[in-house]
Structures are given as C-alpha cells and as structure tokens.
C-alpha cells in the first residue's frame, strides 16, 4: 500500500497502474471520502486515484444541514441561523433552534479546502478524465477512461445514473427541483436571524411547492423556488414564481447577483444492491440522499466516517449498506406523496404544527428514538399511511 506499481498486462499489452482505491467523481462524497481515507491510520498510506471530468468546479452546489454546537465545516460556512420559519395556509411558526443551528455551506470553499488537504498527501492522485466504464473482475477492478485504463482493489463510484431510476417501477421517483436567485437590495429588507425553511403560501397547483429564503445580510439573500414533484418546469415558471413572491413581500428593487438551479432525486430505491465485492456506490449514487427531503450533506459526513471505520476494521464492503426503519418511513412517505402530490403542504404542516422542533429535526436527521417517531407519524393522516403500508406489505403498491 502506498506504492504505485506499473506492470504489463499480457492479455491487453497495456501498462496498468495498480491502486488501492479509485474514486469516481470529485464531488462532495468523493472528495470527503478521499480526505477521510488520507487521515485514517489504517488507510493514509493507501494509493488513491480520484477521477473527475470537470477541473473547474465553482459554486455548483449549496448544502444546508442542522447541527448542534461547533462543527467540522464551520470555518467554511456562508451563514448559519438560530431560527427557522415554517409557513403554510394553516400555520405560521418561527422555531427557535436553541443550541442547534441551520447551517449553509457553498461548494467552492469546500472543494478548495479538500483539494488543498488532499494535495498534501503524495499517495493521492487527482486526474481529470471522463470514465467510460468499469468491471469488477473478482480480484480487482478495471476502470476505463477516455485516455487510460486503471486497475484497483476497490472502486468507489459517486457518479449518479438517472437511468437506474427510470428503468424501474417498484419505487416512486420524485425530484426536489429548484431555481434560486441570489439577490441584493439597496435597503435592508431581510431578517438575518431567521431562515424561511418552507413557505407553502405560494400557489400549489396540485403539487408540493414552496419558497425557501436564506438571508446572509439585511440586503443579501437566496430566494429559492422548490418543488417535490415528478416533472421539471420550464425555467420561466420558476423565475415567474420568484418574481411574484418578491413582489408580494414588497421587494421590488433588487439586483440579481447569481442563479442556482438543480434537481435532486427523491427515491427509496436500494442503490446498494448494485454494489459488488470490490465496487461500492457512494453519495447520491449510493442512496445517501435522504429520500423524503433531498438532504445529502449530513449523510455524507456520517457515511464517510462510518465507511472508513468499516474499511479500517477490514470488514467486507458487502456488509456496510443496510436498510433501517428510516428507509421504510421515507418509502411510505414517498408512496403517499407521489400519489397525492397536492397534499405536501398539508403533510408538512401537520408535522411542524404538532411536534417540537427538537423532535422534528432529530427525526429528519435519523437520530430519533422509536417513541418520538410514533409521535411524528401520528401527525400524518393515519388511514392514508396505514393503507399504503399494507399495500407495500402485500406487494400491491402500483
């Protein structure tokens, strides 16, 4: 481990570089896994190759998460809030998070820091090559790019493939799709202490639609129009919704500084079933996105730590990914939301209206106890969820 070996493969007559780990994709999960492997006593001398197609990563992502006290990424935060607001036609609730904060991290400083840290480890290479395929040979993995062929003991793949979801019918597929405007106003209009977590007072149009407002200063904020639904909108429809929302808030004079747009898969599909002896899917490609909310970053933190501990203990990768009760909760929620997409505001209003903030955020963070989860579930229309549970149980959910 830690030594790059070049040898001649007689069958292909190619010189292949033998590596311990190859990581496909240099995004949040790939870089963080490489970083943690490089810091692990058991793995820090391992030879690691990160393959990514884009050398110029900018602020292509914004990650938000709840955290109590100080955290690993605090020095990189764009902002954090001690209060969040939930609003719908039936409830308007500002939640004091106490010793917990809602934190926002933009991707560029994160990428820059991890690339800097990784560059200090001579056992890690970073190459900008597009992967064209890979194959688990049992004793090793062959990885092909447009320029080269590589061989490794273990491959971690963070490249998400939408076709996996499109080619199956067993699990409903929604998207958390959004368009956000970073705006600057000439006069103070924003409450910097409070993030608007969900504002369902916007027209729902028989879907689950809400506004998300993250103020950085009294004159700077991200205004994001978000949907949990099956199909994307035309860009003009997102933009029109944001304009209408700002107009309703009497924010008419502003400069559009930056635009952010994206789509996150919301599905309980068991991505881990594509893992093999030596190939492990990570990040959204591995099902690390919280299916019912689209949150990913906190899971990446937990999963990369657990995965490196797992590898360090010489445990087989096949034993790493397991279903838990939260997977089932997400599956039932998405079953209901996909069939009754117009009920999203009602479902979230019930949860936020009938539960304490601590209970809600522990539940969404998959850190709650079973009794707390029972109380959360009582917030939802019981008959609807029980009916869907039995459909799943007896395989009649289609």
Model-derived features with residue positions:
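Short beta-strand to alpha-helix junction loop
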Residues: 97-116, 229-237
């Amino acid at each position: 481990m830690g030594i790059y070996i070049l040898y001649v493969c007689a069958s292909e007559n190619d010189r292949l570089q033998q590596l311990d780990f190859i990581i496909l994709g240099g995004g949040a999960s790939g870089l963080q896994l490489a970083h943690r492997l490089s810091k692990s006593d058991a793995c820090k001398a391992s030879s690691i190759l990160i393959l990514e197609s884009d050398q110029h990563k900018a602020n292509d992502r914004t990650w938000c998460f709840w955290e109590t006290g100080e955290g690993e990424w605090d020095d990189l935060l764009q902002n954090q809030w001690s209060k969040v607001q939930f609003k719908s036609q039936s409830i308007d609730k500002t939640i004091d998070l106490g010793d917990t904060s809602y934190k926002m991290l933009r991707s560029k400083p994160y990428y820059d820091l991890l690339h800097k840290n990784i560059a200090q480890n001579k056992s890690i290479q970073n190459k900008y090559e597009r992967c064209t395929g890979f194959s688990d040979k049992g004793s090793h993995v062959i990885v092909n790019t447009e320029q080269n062929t590589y061989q490794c003991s273990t491959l971690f793949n963070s490249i998400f493939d939408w076709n996996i979801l499109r080619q199956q019918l067993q699990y409903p597929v929604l998207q958390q799709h959004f368009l956000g405007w970073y705006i600057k106003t000439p006069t103070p209009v924003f409450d910097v202490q409070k993030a608007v977590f969900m504002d369902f007072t916007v027209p729902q149009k028989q879907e689950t639609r809400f506004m998300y407002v993250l103020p950085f200063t009294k004159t700077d904020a991200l205004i994001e129009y978000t949907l949990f639904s099956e199909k994307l909108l035309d860009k003009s429809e997102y933009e029109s919704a944001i304009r209408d929302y700002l107009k309703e808030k009497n924010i008419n004079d502003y400069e559009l500084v930056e635009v952010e747009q994206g789509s996150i898969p919301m599905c309980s599909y068991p991505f881990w079933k594509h893992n093999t002896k030596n190939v492990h899917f990570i990040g959204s490609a591995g099902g690390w996105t919280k299916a019912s909310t689209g949150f990913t970053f906190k899971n990446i933190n937990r999963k990369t730590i657990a995965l490196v501990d797992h590898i360090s203990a010489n445990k087989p990768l096949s034993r790493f990914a397991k279903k838990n009760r939260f997977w089932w909760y997400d599956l039932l929620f998405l079953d209901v939301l996909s069939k009754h997409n117009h009920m999203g505001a009602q479902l979230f209003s019930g949860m936020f209206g009938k539960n304490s903030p601590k209970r809600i955020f522990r539940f969404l963070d998959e850190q709650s106890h079973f009794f707390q989860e029972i109380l959360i579930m009582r917030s939802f229309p019981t008959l609807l969820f029980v009916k869907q549970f039995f459909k799943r149980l007896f395989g009649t959910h289609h």
